Amino acid sequence: MNAHEADREFEGRSFRDEDLSRLRTERVVFTECDFTGADLSDSDHTGSAFRNCTFRRTSLWHSTFRHCSFLGSSFAECRLRPLTVIEVDFTLAVLANVDLRKADLSDCRLRETSLVGTDLREAVLARADLTGARVQGAKVEGADLRGARVDPTFWTTAAVRGAKVDIDQAIAFAAAHGLDIGG
């Protein structure tokens, strides 16, 4: 793969253990590709899509993803921090047990994403869409959730102590825990 790729498509390709550090992509579509063990550190991606891709033991630290999609992709044992994501779509992705402490996921779509056991302590999830996300055992303590869209089960299954929330979310939290807030 070239150091800079634009307007290309890769389907079912294996990038296992490849050095893709400093890779630049623009509007590139990866479908069902395998990035197991690949080094994508210091890479920069704009408008690219990673559909149903596998990231296992992949290094993504110091990488930037702008307006990208990881629809249905799975991440396991990856080095992600520090990572910059700007309006990224993680719909249906699997980020279970991933370390995203202090990550800025503002304005990202995490609809129906598996965040089971994910460490999101002190992460910024402002205005993120977490509708339908599975968050059993997720650590969200101290995170900024203001303006985030979540389901009632989010409030009962994720550890949210010390999280920053807005008034509507505080009411939703109380209702999810069966509190009578009507007076």
Residue locations for each model-derived region?
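Tandem repeat scaffolds
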Residues: 1-183
